[in-house]
Design a protein with these regions (language model features):
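One-carbon transfer enzymes
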Residues: 1-113
Length: 113
């Protein structure tokens, strides 16, 4: 049996990408979504996460002094949850080196470019 990958999901909107991952996991994809972090409090993806029993956090970068501080907080949330990989599922913010260095080669970088 394959150990599931523990993933954290970052999102900013409706969460359709998150839902696709949730559905695929239900059909046998070996992933365990350990935390969802949203950049917006009104993102419907938060509701999708909670409906699936996945802990969800809203982290508004506006309350942090700089983007690096915000990413450091996101990294702390993901590490606390045990995330090994990060999936950017419609995340509409640029990530800083803080995030990329915390999860080297473990961030879905296609969304970063």
């Amino acid at each position: 049996m394959v150990e599931p990958l523990k993933i954290g999901v970052l999102l900013s909107g409706s969460g359709t990408n998150l839902q696709a991952i949730i559905d695929a996991a239900g059909e046998g994809l070996p992933v365990d979504i350990v935390r969802v972090v949203s950049s917006r409090p009104d993102a419907y993806g938060i509701e999708r996460a909670r409906a699936a029993g996945i802990p969800a956090t809203v982290l508004n970068r506006g309350v942090y002094a700089d983007p690096e501080a915000a990413d450091a907080r996101i990294v702390a949330e993901l590490r606390e949850a045990g995330a090994e990989y990060v999936v950017m599922a419609g995340y509409m913010r640029k990530v800083t080196p803080v995030m990329l260095e915390a999860f080297p080669d473990r961030v879905d970088r296609k969304s970063v470019v």
